[in-house]
Amino acid sequence: MNQVNFDTTRLRQILKKTYFFQSLKMNELDDLISHIRAASFQKGSAVIKQGEAGNAFYLIATGRVSVWIKKAFSKTKVAELFPDQFFGEMALISNEPRSATIIAEEDSSFFVLYQNDFNKILMKNPAVAQELRRIFYERKQKR
């Protein structure tokens, strides 16, 4: 993972499109943005690995990733994610190991919110926390 600089305007646009952040007021959005970092991964790199402890939530800024789940002796590609989509929330909400491996299918950049900051945002914004819990249970049922 490489740390990179990012465009705050682009980040604000992505956050406004991310439905569970849409309820945030401008000052809350600014607070959220102040906690976000940027990172990039090269094509073929594992962004997160199934079974590892989760420590961050990712919003895709550029590129494309694939979602892989390993069961017994097989690995299955279950999804592809594109800019403005997110991943990594499940392990942060459940405090369980990562439920999937995410691979960069091309050089990709991300906006990253680490666990401590993620938890602070959820504590300050119950509507965001509630929506993320709903998404968590929805995704968990699909797996």
Predicted regions and their residues:
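Cytosolic regulatory regions built on CNB/CRP/Popeye-like sensor folds
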Residues: 1-143
